Amino acid sequence: MTEKEVVESPQPPFPGETPQSGLQRLKQLFKKGSPETAEMEPPPEPQANGEAVGAGGGPIYYIYEEEEEEEEEEEPPPEPPKLVNDKPHKFKDHFFKKPKFCDVCARMIVLNNKFGLRCKNCKTNIHEHCQSYVEMQRCFGKIPPGFRRAYSSPLYSDQQYAVSAANRNDPVFETLRVGVIMANKERKKGQADKKNPLAAMMEEEPESARPEEGKSQDGNNAEKDKKAEKKTPDDKNKQPGFQQSHYFVALYRFKALEKDDLDFPPGEKITVIDDSNEEWWRGKIGEKVGFFPPNFIIRVRAGERVHRVTRSFVGNREIGQITLKKDQIVVQKGDEAGGYVKVYTGRKVGLFPTDFLEEI
């Protein structure tokens, strides 16, 4: 114990406050801390100004903390992969002489002086403004020559056939192609087995003539020499088919695709042996015998002449003229009149100038 230690009376926390009132205030604070008293106490009544007054007489302020919600930024969607066309069309500017329909919009290509686009491989025709619709469309390549047998075209080559076969991947197309080839072979075999009366007569004539000539010329060498001298080269080269009232001449070039097909150039004379089938006839040129499509030839009757066009000519339909191209084969149907003659091409008949015709 020191001298400074003196028992001091507790001083009130606020000036002018008695010790008794300070004790009461402490009691009230302890009462607030106990849970039982907290449940029993009524809530503070709000005053007119909206403030709540506590038990101690002072206002109670409520502080609200606003929680700001952070918006998560959405990630941008990934860019779709760019599609790449491995076999696009090869379009080129093309002038359509005849009206064609667009393969995209199915409308006729008539605007801009009939200019449009045509694929180099598959021959697809479209408008220029329709090109964007076929950018991702695959080009199926060149059409195989096996389905173009009704046309005279230089596409009949092994090299182009191999290219078209390499571009072809459709199994349905392969099945149909094989079926068509097998059907043609079976049909041709059946036709070869049937005997044609015309061919039988042609084969029997030389056989029946040989024994008669042998009997009459036995031991007569002098007479044989005389008969040989009397025979002219024209009589030897005569063919049985040309002794009839008509014969056939090739209009177009036909190149054989199979072994039993008959190959011939335009203007060649052909002897028809079997015409029972509408799609394939059997004919003979010299010693060659084979099948060919009938729309490649034309019938020439007695008194008619065959000509070759030496120069292209555009005729006037109003006066009955016909338009023909160079090297085309035609048949004359009448006499010359005014420098023009009536000709027939198998499909069209009209007047053509005689100066542009060469007889074959």
Curated annotation (Swiss-Prot):
Residue ranges annotated as zinc fingers (Phorbol-ester/DAG-type) are: 88-139
Compositionally biased intervals (Basic and acidic residues): 207-238
For the null mutant, the annotation states:
Complete perinatal lethality, due to paralysis and inability to breathe. Embryos have a curved body with abnormal curvature of the vertebral spine and drooping forelimbs. They display multiple skeletal abnormalities involving ribs, sternum and costal cartilage, and strongly reduced formation of bone ridges at major muscle attachment sites. They weigh about 15% less than wild-type at 18.5 dpc. They do not move or respond to touch, but have a beating heart when dissected out of the uterus.
Which keywords belong to this entry? Cell membrane, Cytoplasm, Membrane, Metal-binding, Repeat, SH3 domain, Zinc, Zinc-finger
Per the database record, which ranges form the SH3 domain? Answer: 243-302, 303-360
Biological processes, Gene Ontology terms: neuromuscular synaptic transmission; positive regulation of protein localization to plasma membrane; positive regulation of voltage-gated calcium channel activity; skeletal muscle contraction; skeletal muscle fiber development
* Organism classification: Eukaryota, Metazoa, Chordata, Craniata, Vertebrata
Q: Which Pfam families match?
A: C1_1, SH3_1, SH3_2, STAC2_u1
Function field: Required for normal excitation-contraction coupling in skeletal muscle and for normal muscle contraction in response to membrane depolarization. Required for normal Ca(2+) release from the sarcplasmic reticulum, which ultimately leads to muscle contraction. Probably functions via its effects on muscle calcium channels. Increases CACNA1S channel activity, in addition to its role in enhancing the expression of CACNA1S at the cell membrane. Has a redundant role in promoting the expression of the calcium channel CACNA1S at the cell membrane.
Compositionally biased region (Acidic residues): 64-77
Gene Ontology cellular-component terms for this entry are:
cytoplasmic side of plasma membrane; cytosol; nucleoplasm; synapse; T-tubule; voltage-gated calcium channel complex
> Which GO terms label this protein's molecular function in UniProt?
identical protein binding; zinc ion binding
Native source organism of the sequence: Mus musculus
Bilayer topology term: Peripheral membrane protein
What's the protein called, per UniProt? SH3 and cysteine-rich domain-containing protein 3
Primary location group: cytoplasm
Record's subcellular location: Cytoplasm; Cell membrane, Sarcolemma; Cell membrane, Sarcolemma, T-tubule
How the protein assembles, per its UniProt entry? Interacts (via SH3 domains) with the calcium channels CACNA1S and CACNA1C. Component of a calcium channel complex with CACNA1S and CACNB1. Component of a calcium channel complex with CACNA1C and CACNB1.
**Protein's UniProt keywords contain Zinc-finger:** yes
Known tissue expression: Dected in skeletal muscle, including soleus, extensor digitorum longus, tibialis anterior, quadriceps and gastrocnemius. Detected in tongue.
Note down the stretches annotated as region Disordered: 1-86, 187-241
